Amino acid sequence: MKKIYDFFNYYVFGKELGVLPGSLAYSFFLAIIPILSLLFYLLSSFNLPLDMVQNFLSDTFPEGVVNLLQPIFTDTITMNSIITLVIAVMVATNGCNAIILASNTIYNIENAPIVRRTIKSLFLTIVMIILIAFVVVVPLFGKSILNILLKVFVGQEKFLTTLFLILRVPVSLVVIFTIIKLLYVVAPDQRISSKYVNRGAAFTAICWLIVTYIYSFYINNIARYDLVYGNLTNIVILLLWFYILAYVFVIGLYLNRHKTDTEIEKTNTYKLEEIRKKVQEEKHKK
C-alpha cells in the first residue's frame, strides 16, 4: 500500500504536474493552428477532400469551436508565400519544443543546445502532423476500403461491417501508440531505450482516446461554459481539452521515468551481485 501511495505521490501528483501540463497545453494551443494549416496544405496538394477534417471537428467539438477553427479550411491560404510557411513552421515547432523541455524536466536531463533542439522540434512537428493526419484522414480511407470490399464480396455486408467496427479501434490504438512511443523516445535530450516507454505510450494512447470521447460527450451534452466565460467559451473549451491531453502525456512521461529508474536499479543490483561473487571467488582462491 505504501508503494502505491509513494508512486502516486511522486509520479502522479508530483510538483511538475502543477506546471508542465499547463505549459504544454498553452504551447499546443498556439501550435495547433499552424499545424492544421500545414495539414490543410498537404491535403490540398494531394487533392484529398477537406470535409473529413471538418467532420472530425464537428464530431469532437461543439459548434462554436468548429466555427472558431473554420477559417483555416475555408479561407484561401497562400502557401506559396515563403514567409507564411516559415512562420507557420516556427510557431508549430514551439509546441514540440515544449515536449522536449517537459521530457528533460521529468528525466532530470540538461537541455541540449538550442540548434539541436530546433532540429529535433522540426522532426517532432512532422511526427505530430502525421499523428493528426492519421486521426482525421484514416477514418475516411477506412470507409472507402470498406465500400470497395462490400462491392467485391457481395452478400458479406454484415460480416465485413462488423469486422470493420471491431478492428477500427485496435488499429487506431496501435498506430497512435507507435507515434506516441516515438515522441517519448526521441523527445528527451538523452538516449532512452524504447523498451522503457511502452507503458507510458500505451497509457497515453488509450487515455487520449477515452478522454477525447468523454470530453466531447460532456461538452456537447452537459457542460455550459458559456454561462461563465461568455464569448471566450470556445477558446476555453480548446484550452481545457489540450490541458487534459497534456496532463495525460506528462503522466505517461512519469510512468516511463519510473520504469527507467526501476530497470536501472535492477541492473545496478545485478552488477553489484556479480562483483560480490567475483570478490568471494577471489578470496576462496587465495
Regions found by a protein language model. Name each.
Residues M1-K286:
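Membrane-embedded alpha-helices and immediately adjacent juxtamembrane helical segments
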